[in-house]
């Protein structure tokens, strides 16, 4: 089983920890320089794209205008009823969002996704995202735009893995359920408005649902969370998962989700001021949570993995977790959450961590499956850009000289 806890904690986690600790913390000399003209053109494109995206997200129709689907289960559409006809404003908003996606995929000049993927692949990629958004709109019309974006990002990781492994795009109920779980669970647990007792009940409910035990639902939010888990279990095990992972594939994904729940619970310690955490404690929490999250994403594409591939995807999750933490330095410092980035005491120390992140990324991609070299290069460049933009978003925690060096 891939999600054997002893395997995760005794084999994968120590190797990723070792890769991180062995990575250099000096400024990377492998970043490609960008000419001043190209930089200005890129900045202008990014600024315009972000302004359009932000305006569009702010124009999200108010919840009072959005049709509420009853019941919300996507599994039995013939039983669904609507409290009113779908709001025209929401339909228009979704169409415009699809147009924005098209521009981002086909016109984006920086990362070169149009050079890494064929036109047919890009079209399929866009279609799968549209399908995902339609399912989100049907399942949770009340969802905030930022939470919708979070779920979409989770789904895009899965879609990228399918492209990386030469598989056609799709949007099965399992990956819909898993992509939506993060905004439904992690955000609930991070929200200080919920009491510790509410969070304990919520975690217990999830644990029981994954384990196949009876559950008591106290709210619509809990009911929808249970439905998302049911969407996953509805297709596991399947002939494809059994062929890829063996007869225990259904048990394996349940174990993976239980470990992910445990990782979310452990991560709450980062904000508990009464607990003493060493740098290694903080590091291991981030590796465990980030690594499991992405390894589960990869599991859902139903394609057998080598030991090296498992290690890459687990390490890739840690990379994405660190990018999140890099972007959230100010917020994490404000609420007392200790991460490898927020725990830095000086701008120099923070810069060294970012340098190490670049070096770690380079070392990790030596393990990257290489069925499509152009797509691998695109993915690596995307990671570099993610680190750069995350650092820029937390610019107040760096020296100006370091930020200027990154900009070059």
Regions found by a protein language model. Give the residues of each.
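Intrinsically disordered, low-structural-confidence terminal and linker regions
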Residues: 1-43
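Amphipathic alpha-helical protein-interaction segments
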Residues: 21-28, 38, 45-83, 172-180, ...
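C-terminal anion-handling pockets and recognition modules
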Residues: 368-391
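All-alpha helical catalytic cores of prenyl diphosphate-utilizing isoprenoid enzymes
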Residues: 109-181, 187-188, 192-330, 390-391, ...
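Accessory, usually C-terminal, subdomains that scaffold auxiliary metal cofactors
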Residues: 340-348
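Low-complexity, highly charged intrinsically disordered N-terminal segments
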Residues: 74-127
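Long, compositionally biased intrinsically disordered regions
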Residues: 358-362, 391-408
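A short, conserved beta-to-alpha structural element at the edge of catalytic cores
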Residues: 213-217, 348-366
């Amino acid at each position: 089983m891939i999600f054997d806890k002893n395997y995760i904690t005794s084999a994968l986690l120590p190797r990723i920890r070792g890769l991180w600790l062995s990575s250099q913390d000096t400024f990377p000399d492998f970043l490609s320089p960008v000419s001043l003209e190209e930089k200005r053109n890129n900045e202008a494109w990014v600024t315009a794209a972000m302004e359009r995206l932000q305006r569009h997200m702010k124009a999200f129709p108010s919840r009072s205008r959005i049709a509420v689907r009853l019941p919300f289960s996507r599994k039995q559409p013939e039983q669904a009823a609507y409290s009113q006809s779908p709001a025209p404003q929401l339909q228009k908003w979704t169409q415009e969002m699809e147009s924005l996606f098209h521009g981002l995929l086909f016109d984006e000049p920086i990362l070169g996704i149009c050079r890494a993927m064929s036109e047919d692949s890009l079209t399929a990629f866009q279609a799968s995202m549209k399908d995902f958004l339609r399912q989100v709109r049907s399942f949770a019309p009340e969802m905030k735009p930022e939470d919708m974006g979070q779920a979409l990002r989770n789904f895009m990781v899965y879609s990228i893995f399918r492209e990386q492994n030469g598989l056609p795009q799709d949007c099965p109920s399992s990956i819909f359920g898993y992509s939506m779980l993060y905004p439904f669970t992690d955000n609930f647990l991070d929200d200080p408005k919920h009491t510790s007792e509410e969070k304990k009940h919520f975690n217990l409910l999830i644990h029981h649902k994954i384990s196949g035990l009876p559950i008591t639902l106290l709210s619509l939010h809990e009911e929808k969370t249970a439905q998302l888990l049911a969407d996953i279990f509805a297709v596991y095990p399947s002939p494809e998962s059994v062929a890829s992972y063996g007869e225990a594939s259904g048990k394996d994904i349940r174990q993976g989700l239980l470990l992910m729940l445990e990782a979310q619970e452990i991560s709450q310690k980062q904000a508990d001021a009464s607990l003493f955490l060493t740098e290694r404690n903080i590091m291991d929490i981030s590796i465990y949570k980030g690594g499991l999250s992405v390894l589960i994403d990869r599991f859902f594409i139903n394609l057998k993995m080598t030991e090296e591939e498992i290690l890459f995807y687990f390490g890739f999750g840690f990379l994405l977790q660190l990018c999140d933490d890099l972007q959230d330095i100010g917020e994490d410092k404000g609420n007392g959450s200790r991460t490898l980035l927020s725990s830095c005491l000086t701008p120099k120390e923070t810069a060294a961590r970012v340098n190490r992140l670049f070096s770690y990324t380079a070392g990790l991609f030596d393990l990257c499956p290489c069925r499509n070299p152009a797509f691998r290069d695109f993915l690596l460049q995307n990671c570099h850009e993610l680190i750069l933009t995350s650092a820029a978003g937390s610019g107040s925690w760096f020296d100006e000289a370091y930020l200027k060096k990154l900009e070059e």
